[in-house]
Amino acid sequence: MLRYYGATRNLPLVFSINKFMLRPSSFARPFHYSSYSLQNDDTPDKGSTNKSEIRTPNNTVWKENIELQWQHLKKKLNELYSRFNFHRDQLSFQVNKAKKSIQEANRKLSEQENEINDSRLNYNKDELTSAKIEGLPSEREQHRKKWSRKLEFYFDSLQETLFTATRALNDVTGYSGIQKLKSSISLMEKKLEATKKEHKLFKAQYANAIDERAQSQREVNELLQRQSAWSSSDLERFTQLYKNDALNARQEQELKNKVKEIESKEEQLNDDLYRAILTRYHEEQIWSDKIRRTSTWGTFILMGMNIFLFIVLQLLLEPWKRKRLVGSFEDKVKSALNEYAKEQNMKMDKLLPGKSSEVTDQGNTKNSIVEEHIEQRGECKINTAETDRPEVATAEATTTAMKSFRDIWERIKALFVTLKSIQYRKLDAPLVFDTLEFYLYSISLVSMTILVSGLI
């Protein structure tokens, strides 16, 4: 509210935002920070004009803050609801996909049962020996229990739902095209079966049409033989047979054309199915060769990585670890011997106070003896650690010269005995090999890996 105390006597002019009013000065409220009085000819300064702004009520500020908080909370709730809907849709999609996979597994199981009972797929005669071929996969499937086959189909169908990486791998390796070719082959087989049924139907209709026409022609010939003795009914019958003969000839020709068309379609489907099956087996052979080459190279890469890691561990990490252990052991021994020497010096000082100089000299000599003892302990630390394993000591004591295959075999046996005697649970137990044993171990590892990969 703005107030103006001006030239009028005792009636101030009160300027308000809402209304304009006059009231006595005794009833006017005193000056506060939201009103500005201009008495006589006083003019406000620039500093006071900045304070002439109207103060907003507290309830308006409170409403604005509440509204901002409500809008922010509403936005968060909308985001949470949209996220919940997204995850719900994803869950329902996966559940429906799992249901479809189970239905597909049931369908495959029923198809397998039908294939077992199909007489066309039961040919098991060996042409060379005229004996029965045994050990076919279909026979083994027959001997399996139904629940195990059903469980296998369920796992195979759910694998496509749970492991989408398989589909990506198939796309990368090209097996998705082979699967499409397999599905097209199954569709072609169904079309061929339907075409064969249709061919049989039209062929039967064509045979019936030929029989009907032949019968009508025989009846016409009989009527023509006794043409001189025709009656009115014979004349009507001859006329009807003549008309039917024309219709039968037309129907016979149509059925003949349809039979030819169905036969050509059946031959085309047979040729396409034969070529599709050949293409499928050819592509599967190419795919299997590609996967075999990839697995071989992967095996070699893994073998190289193992050898590299073994070399790094034996040539870099193990010496560093051994050096660190030896250094920590030396520091502990030095600190322990120094403490022991100090204690002995203090005891000698208490017992013989007059001979302190001699004690100090003896302490110096003891320190020199301790240092020499530490050096000797640092040099023979590995040898003392190896006394618990006589096999390792004997392996290092043997000469590196080998003169025959028997020496090589004995050396390899000693190497494996050494490996067997290693205490793997103790991290501070060093692995001691010489250069020849290391090369023998690497060569045996490489040869065994190549042998296993070749057998696979």
Curated annotation (Swiss-Prot):
Subunit-structure text: Homooligomer.
InterPro entries linked to this entry: MDM33_fungi
TM annotation in the entry: 297-317, 436-456
Keyword Membrane: yes
Coiled-coil intervals: 71-128, 178-277
Topological region Mitochondrial intermembrane: 318-435
GO cellular component, one term: mitochondrial inner membrane
Stretches assigned to the Mitochondrial matrix side: 32-296
Membrane topology summary: Multi-pass membrane protein
Similarity-based family: Belongs to the SHE9 family.
Source taxonomy: Eukaryota, Fungi, Dikarya, Ascomycota, Saccharomycotina
Annotated GO biological process: inner mitochondrial membrane organization
Stretch forming the transit peptide: 1-30
Protein name: Sensitive to high expression protein 9, mitochondrial
Keywords attached to this entry: Coiled coil, Membrane, Mitochondrion, Mitochondrion inner membrane, Transit peptide, Transmembrane, Transmembrane helix
Record localization: Mitochondrion inner membrane
